[in-house]
C-alpha cells in the first residue's frame, strides 16, 4: 500500500530535525524547469499568480533567486500545517519513519512527488497555480502516476490510499493507474447532511498517517478501526474504493 498526502503551504525550517539518512527528490530535472519559470517572475507577478501578499511575494522571489543556496530539510520535517502536525513526526520511531519512506508519497507543486526523507528547500507553489502555459496538474500527472505504478508493483498489497486534497490528488491519472485507488473521506453531520469540514479532515488525515507508521499498516482494510476526533468507520457509506469515516 502507498498513501498520498498533500504538501503544505506552511513550512518550518527553524526547528532542527533529527539526524536521519536523507534522500534526493526523484524529479529534480522537472523541478528545475519550474524554477526557471518562477525565477523569471517579478515580485508583483508572483503576488498575482499565487494570490499572496507583497511581503510573501518578496520572500519567495528571494528564495527562488538563490534557490541552490537555501537551507535543505527532510520533507516530512519541513512541512507544517494541520496534516503534518497531527502525524507527530517527532515522536515516530526510526522503524516507523523508515516504513513511511516506502509507504508514503507527499504530492508537491514544485517537486512533484516526495518520499518523507527527500530533502527540500523553502518554497511556495500550490498545485492550482498557473505558470505561463504550464498547468501543474497536467505537468506532473504522467510522471507521478507512472512512479506510483512502479512503487505499487513492488508492494505486497497494491493499493493507493488517497489522503490528499482534491487539488493534489488530481495529479493521479485514473486511466493510467494500474492498481486500486482507495479514497478516504472524513465527514460530519451538519444540518442533516454529511459534509467535509476542512480543518478537521486535515487533522484526521495526519492522524491516519501516524497510525499507518506506528502500526506498519499496508492494507486499507486494517484502517477500519481508526478513530480520532470522534470519527468512526461507516460501513453503510463505504465501498471497496471509498473509506468513509463519520464524526459522531
Curated annotation (Swiss-Prot):
Signal peptide: none annotated. It holds the Pfam family H2O2_YaaD. InterPro entries: YaaA (IPR005583). GO terms for biological process: response to hydroperoxide. One of its GO terms (cellular component) is cytosol. Belongs to the UPF0246 family. PANTHER family: PEROXIDE STRESS RESISTANCE PROTEIN YAAA (PTHR30283:SF4), PEROXIDE STRESS RESPONSE PROTEIN YAAA (PTHR30283). This is UPF0246 protein RAF_ORF0648. It comes from Rickettsia africae (strain ESF-5). The lineage of its organism: Bacteria, Pseudomonadati, Pseudomonadota, Alphaproteobacteria, Rickettsiales.
Amino acid at each position: 500500500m502507498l498513501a498520498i498526502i498533500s504538501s503544505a503551504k506552511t513550512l518550518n525550517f527553524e526547528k532542527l530535525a533529527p539526524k536521519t539518512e536523507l534522500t534526493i527528490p526523484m524529479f529534480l530535472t522537472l523541478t528545475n524547469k519550474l524554477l526557471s519559470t518562477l525565477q523569471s517572475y517579478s515580485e508583483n507577478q508572483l503576488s498575482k499568480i499565487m494570490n499572496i501578499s507583497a511581503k510573501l511575494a518578496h520572500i519567495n522571489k528571494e528564495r527562488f533567486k538563490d534557490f541552490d543556496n537555501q537551507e535543505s530539510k527532510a520533507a516530512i520535517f519541513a512541512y507544517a500545517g494541520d496534516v503534518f502536525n497531527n502525524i507527530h513526526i517527532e515522536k515516530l520511531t526510526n522503524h516507523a519513519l523508515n516504513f513511511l519512506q516506502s509507504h508514503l508519497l507527499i504530492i508537491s507543486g514544485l517537486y512533484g512527488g516526495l518520499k518523507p526523507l527527500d530533502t527540500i528547500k523553502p518554497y511556495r507553489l500550490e498545485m492550482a497555480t498557473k505558470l505561463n502555459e504550464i498547468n501543474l496538474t497536467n505537468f506532473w500527472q504522467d510522471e507521478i502516476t507512472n512512479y506510483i505504478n512502479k512503487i505499487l508493483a513492488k508492494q505486497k498489497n497494491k493499493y493507493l490510499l488517497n489522503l490528499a486534497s482534491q487539488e493534489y490528488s488530481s495529479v493521479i491519472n485514473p486511466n493510467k493507474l494500474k492498481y486500486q485507488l482507495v479514497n478516504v473521506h472524513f465527514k460530519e453531520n451538519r444540518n442533516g447532511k454529511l459534509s467535509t469540514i476542512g480543518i478537521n479532515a486535515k487533522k484526521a488525515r495526519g492522524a491516519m498517517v501516524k497510525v499507518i507508521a506506528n502500526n506498519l499498516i499496508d492494507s486499507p482494510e486494517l484502517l477500519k478501526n481508526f478513530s480520532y476526533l470522534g470519527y468512526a468507520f461507516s460501513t453503510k457509506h463505504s465501498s471497496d474504493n471509498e473509506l468513509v469515516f463519520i464524526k459522531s
